[in-house]
Amino acid sequence: PKVKRTDNEIAKFKIMTPAQLVKKGSDFLKKNKIKTHQIDSELILSGLIGKSREDLLISLDFELNKSLITSFNSSISRRGVKREPIAYILNKKEFWSLNFKVHPGILIPRPETELMVEKIVKYYKNDNPYILDIGTGSGCIIISLLKELKNSKGVAIDISKVALKIAKKNSIINNTANRIKFINSSVLKINNFK
């Protein structure tokens, strides 16, 4: 049986340092049967502060403001009670050593997909293929391929306008926007991809 805690219970954290906040967040997640409680607490706080997890762990003794503590408590509750993935809570996910925005309703990039990107890059490393990404979602596949295959271009198709909006933002963040044509459509309705 899951242990449920309310936002009010989490809000009673009266904490001033990152070390204390990470500990309380980790304890809360552990009580709610989150196996990755420690790393999740660290990732949430580092994401909210805007530092890498490593940088956060090096400097755990500075004071936090109430606004950040409130955001942390809300995020920990989303993870522990609602079971939301960290990527959706932070609205970002690293893939192929690149940063991608993600959003509920768009699949979170998975490490296994990096194996596919790796094989495609290895196979086409001396070519300039025209890439077609059907169901692009966050755009992580086509953007990662274009970062490696410097002279390639491609088309990203998705039926979801929300997904395409996120994919376009990701292409701008990762400097590939000028090499991708985005199409909002079902692949079954498209005749010409160029």
Label for each model-derived stretch:
Residues 11-49, 53-56, 61-64:
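Non-catalytic accessory regions of SAM-dependent methyltransferases
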Residues 25, 75, 166-167:
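Aromatic/hydrophobic pocket-lining residues that form π-stacking "cages" and hydrophobic walls in ligand
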Residues 112-194:
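Conserved SAM/SAH cofactor-binding pocket of Class I
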